[in-house]
């Protein structure tokens, strides 16, 4: 999602239409990737959450975007990139809280150092497809593109966060999708190839899979 060119126009839908859209999410295609040839290091959910360094900085429930929200049990995780070379996670949190994004919002912004949570996970955001199934059924994660940050560190932190959310909500790896999946948009641009999922997206999914396996691996029993 390009946060420098955000529309403030809201689309208001009746509840039956929203519920219908929620059930109409198509099944994503399977992503082919090479499994990381590294033994998974066992982590608990709390350990990996600490590694992600999640900070809550919620928008006001009275904000324009949150007033239009609906309750949600997430079935997808949608990955975006900010297309903002200057704004880190804290800057995006401030922008959301002062209403600079209009009717748009999402659940997390991730940068090199932290992941900032903007809204509750049981609440819809407006980040994927203007009130369609992507908004109604997915957690939105924006990956920062700060010029002075190491992008690989940001991507790995995002992969860890994704793995934690997958386990928390029993979301299959197949349902971790780029913004491109919902609208064909070139987003997250740094992880797409010629505007489409390719080898870079497969690499990211392999990292998510690795951290997922870390959460599912039991520590070796003491001898």
Model regions and ranges:
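N-terminal catalytic cores of peptidoglycan-degrading enzymes
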Residues: 22-130
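N-terminal secretory signal peptides that target proteins for export/translocation
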Residues: 1-4
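Solvent-exposed, acidic/flexible segments
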Residues: 70-72, 101, 132-134, 147-158
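Glycine-rich, often proline-containing surface loops adjacent to acidic residues and nearby aromatics
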Residues: 135-143
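Second-shell loop/turn segments in exported
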Residues: 65-66, 105, 142-152
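Basic/polar, cationic surfaces and motifs that engage anionic cell-wall
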Residues: 22-54, 147-223
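Bacterial N-terminal signal peptides
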Residues: 9-18
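A cross-domain feature marking catalytic cores of carbohydrate-active enzymes
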Residues: 81, 110, 143, 178-180
């Amino acid at each position: 999602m390009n946060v420098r060119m955000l529309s403030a126009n809201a689309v208001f839908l009746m509840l039956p239409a929203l519920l219908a859209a929620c059930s109409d999410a198509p099944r994503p295609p399977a992503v082919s990737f090479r499994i990381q040839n590294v033994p998974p290091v066992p982590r608990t959910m709390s350990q990996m959450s600490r590694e992600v360094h999640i900070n809550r900085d919620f928008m006001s429930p009275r904000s324009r975007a949150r007033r239009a929200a609906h309750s949600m049990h997430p079935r997808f995780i949608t990955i975006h990139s900010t297309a903002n070379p200057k704004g880190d996670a804290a800057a995006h949190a401030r922008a959301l809280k002062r209403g600079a994004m209009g009717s748009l919002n999402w659940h997390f912004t991730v940068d090199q150092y932290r992941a900032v949570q903007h809204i509750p996970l049981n609440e819809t955001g407006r980040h994927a497809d203007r009130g369609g199934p992507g908004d109604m059924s997915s957690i939105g994660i924006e990956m920062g593109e700060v010029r002075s940050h190491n992008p690989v560190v940001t991507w790995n932190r995002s992969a860890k966060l994704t793995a934690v959310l997958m386990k928390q909500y029993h979301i299959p790896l197949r349902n971790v999708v780029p913004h491109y999946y919902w609208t064909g948009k070139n987003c997250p641009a740094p992880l797409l190839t010629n505007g489409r999922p390719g080898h870079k997206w497969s690499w990211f999914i392999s990292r998510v899979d690795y951290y997922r396996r870390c959460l599912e691996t039991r520590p070796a029993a003491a001898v």
